[in-house]
Amino acid sequence: IRYDRPYRKCARIVGDTMGKYHPHGDSSIYDALVVMAQDFKKGRTLVDGHGNFGSIEGDGAAAMRYTEARLEKLTQDVFLSDLDKNVVDFVPNFDETEKEPSVLPVRIPNILVNGADGIAVGMATSIPPHNLGEVIDAVKAYMKDNTISVKGLMRYIKGPDFPTGGIVVNKDDLHKIYETGSGKIRLRGKVEVEKLKGGRKQLVITEIPYTMLGANIGKFLNDVASLIETKKTTDIVDISNQSSKEGIRIVLELKKDTDVENLTNMLYKKTRLEDTFGVNMLAVADGRPETLSLKQIIEYHVDFVFEITTRKYHTLLDKELEKQEVQEGLIKACDVIDLIIEILRGSKNREQVRKCLVEGITEGIKFKSKASEKAAAKLLFTERQANAILDMRLYKL
């Protein structure tokens, strides 16, 4: 399911995942896949979905037998690169028939970029998403100066960046939230005023609080309709939801001479056009759940990237040293090529040759002379060098 290969049926992906790694039912796997493909829920989608993957109004995705998916390029490059270079440990899967990475060698703090939410026994986490560029800039700033404060990091990360947009009302509280890892963010929808013919106006909502996602959009429309029916406002003539794949567009057509500011404030007060997002930056750190500050999350991430980068280059170095060892052995073999061919001709099997090349044991090998046998006993190639010589075709030798 690489990004540069054709889409694959989601039913196949879910089946493979359940059979190899997650024997706990297909619905939870498919739900997770769908969320990772929804750009209105994730700041950066990790799955490239093809087909009906639901809508911002809360419509569900089509059944997995109809939809297709593959990885986004970002996922391939940032989450899965260098897995073949021993950057993380591999552990057996649930039935010990496969190996799987204990963690993915992700090169960005995805917990900040895409946020996280979930519940467990006695604990819950709720981390808002942030702008990828801002997060990377903050990580770079920490790497230059690891004594930087949360306030210093906030010069780069201005605040949450929700995929649905919205305006943070209590910006002054963000420092405390990022310092302690918990708090509440007050969000407002973005309202624009458009002028119509005849001096009339309409309010257009182009961004909504993240908490208004899904069925809550319909609830907002019902709440506005209820305000009209109960005559708590007489300024709204019509309401329509014109949202599409291009984005949110909820239109409130107004009477002439409506006090737009008063009406907007009433909508903030009486509906979910203003709402709170609870923050609890709980994560598993060193095997234990811990509420982390913004700086701690970045610190853990940088330490992790340092670890996987160190492991990567240790692996590459080991491979180059092995290659060097083999090349040195082949160079040495070139100098005694006639003797090696004599050993090959005089031996009965591969093991005899190996013992002669590595340990200097000449027993059972027929030599042309005692001098040759004496020289063969002093070759002393390494095990790796001997195998390289034995694996090489004679014409190459």
Question: At which residue positions do the language-model features occur?
Answer:
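Long, charged, helix-rich clamp/arm modules that form nucleic acid-engaging surfaces
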Residues: 1, 10, 17-21, 161, ...
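Catalytic phosphate-handling regions of large nucleic-acid enzymes and associated NTPases
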Residues: 1-181, 249-251
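Flexible hinge/switch segments at interdomain interfaces of large molecular machines
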Residues: 7-9, 44-50, 114, 183-204, ...
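Short amphipathic alpha-helical segments
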Residues: 29, 67, 131, 212-216, ...
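Structured core elements
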Residues: 30, 34-36, 46, 54-55, ...
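Alpha-helical scaffold elements adjacent to nucleotide-binding pockets in ATP/GTP-utilizing enzyme cores
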Residues: 32-36, 66-74, 134-139, 219-223, ...
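Long amphipathic alpha-helical segments
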Residues: 73-75, 79, 83, 219, ...
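Long hydrophobic segments that form regular secondary structure
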Residues: 192-239
